Amino acid sequence: MTLDNYNIFNDEYLFNMPLSPLPKVLGSFEAQSVLTLTTPTLTPTTTRNIEDTIGHLLSDTQADRGAGCAGFAVPKVLPNAMGAIEALGMGIPSGVTTIPIQTSYDMSLAQASESEDSNASYNDMQMNEEQDTTDTSSAHTDSTSYQTGHIMAGSVNGGGANNFTNVLAAVNSSRGVASAGSSNANTSNTPARRGGGRRPNRSTNMTPEEEQKRAVRRERNKQAAARCRKRRVDQTNELTEEVEQLEKRGDAMRKEIEALTNSKSELEYLLIAHRSTCQKIRSDMLSVNTCNGLIAPTGLLSAGSNGSGASSHHNHNSNDSSNGTITGMDATLNSTGRSNSPLDLKPSANIESLMLHIKDEPLDSTIDSGSSLDQNGPPPSKRVTLPPMSTMPHMSTLMTPTGASSGSLQTPITSTAPVAFGSAFPVTTNGSSINCITINSISNNNMNSPTLNALNKVPKERPNTLAFQRPMAQMHLTLPNNKAGGPTQIQGVPIQTPSTGTFNFDSLMDGGTGLTPVSGPLVPNSSSTNKHPLELPTPTAEPSKLVSL
């Protein structure tokens, strides 16, 4: 047996039923929990309450209840509803009879089926009333007024325009009467609350101290919630500002990338267009001209090659290549001598013009006392080109001074100097006068090798004689009273140093080293006739200094 047998949802009711929202329709069938305006969506708690309500309405299926065995109380059909149906011109279908009015059954069925839920519904209504007395929120007010039936007030008298609403009001009134009649004896029993929901605002067994603590706790929770909301808002604002800054930075970087890409494209285009010209310039720059081992411009190549003559030799293993080019790191050069050194591209002057600027300096008339006699020390810093051998004499006569009164000094000393040394430095002494050392002037036209490399390749010979000069070249050394002995006066000035005398064998042995001065002038004897010492001048030309031969 279904609900259609009672003709509740037939055509006459469906067409006359107004378009009401679903929460209002469902809220008319239960009194325990309803959908309030504060919870417009279906939650698990409200869904369970709805299921419990529908389950209680449809749970009674006993056969002895007759027409009301489905648990649904048949509403009363009012006369004004039937009149409205006839006025609308909708006839009753042929298979549908008039709806029986079962007033006595409604009361008994409601009392028998709803007696078990009376206590729970009464307690829930009491708690809702307590919340309404303490809370001032509009949600509780709306839910309470909706639950007590204030919304549907006045809809019963609406005539035939709202017939289905009248039916629901009749059902609600019958349930309210049944619950009110059966709940007077069971008010002392307070069962546990069913379902979820908010905790009641006021408790009957709470002391004032506990109420004060609850108020303080609620105030503290409100402040904490406000701080949390403020912190969340601040964090959201900070994140929003950071996102905006990052977006601006990203836009700037994208613009910079576009600018760099454009610059790269332009540079690549310029390189491609310049590549053909760059190869020719590079080949011209890496070709270097040389003249006798020195890098020179192209115009001086022929002049340097002609001036060198036969002394310019082509050497494949040295840097003195005269073919005009050298080979470096690139294949355009022809020699490998400068491969590991950087190229010197400075232009150099002509070799002939360089030789004209060399100044002729005479050889020093005195020999440095710090230099060794056998020329074992470092070479001197000054280098003078030797003249040709044919223009210089091969002999130089070295004679000791002789006097008319000194017969022991009449033996001439003649020595032959080597060709390379004596021809370049002729030394001659006659009588008491000593000529200075002369040096022949060197002419640039007599040079066979105009290059510096050729000058360095001339072989050198070691000298085996010593060029010297008397410190007093124009002075006469005279003996007083024409007696035999060493000179003791120079132009009437007596000499007080012991270096004026000669050292004989006995004085050298007795003196120890020969450098020890002896008292008084020594007169040369017969054994020291041919052993006249050669005095060497010092840089200060002082005769008082002792020099050992």
UniProtKB/Swiss-Prot annotation:
It comes from the Eukaryota. Residues 177-233, 304-346, 363-390, 510-549 are annotated as: Disordered. Its main location: nucleus. GO terms for cellular component: nucleus. It is found in: Nucleus. One of its GO terms (biological process) is embryo development ending in birth or egg hatching. Residues 239-246 are annotated as: Leucine-zipper. InterPro entries: AP-1 (IPR000837), bZIP (IPR004827), bZIP_sf (IPR046347). Residues 211-274 form the bZIP domain. SUPFAM superfamilies: Leucine zipper domain. The keyword Nucleus applies. Residues 332-342, 366-375 have a biased composition (Polar residues). GO terms for molecular function: DNA binding; DNA-binding transcription factor activity, RNA polymerase II-specific; RNA polymerase II cis-regulatory region sequence-specific DNA binding. SMART domains: BRLZ. The keyword Transcription applies. Residues 213-232 are annotated as: Basic motif. The modification Phosphoserine is found at residue 341. Residues 177-193, 304-324 have a biased composition (Low complexity). It holds the Pfam family bZIP_1. Signal peptide: none annotated. Keywords: Activator, DNA-binding, Nucleus, Phosphoprotein, Transcription, Transcription regulation. Developmentally regulated transcription factor AP-1 binds and recognizes the enhancer DNA sequence: 5'-TGA[CG]TCA-3'. May play a role in the function or determination of a particular subset of cells in the developing embryo. It is able to carry out its function either independently of or in conjunction with Jra. Belongs to the bZIP family. Fos subfamily. This is Transcription factor kayak. The lineage of its organism: Eukaryota, Metazoa, Ecdysozoa, Arthropoda, Hexapoda.
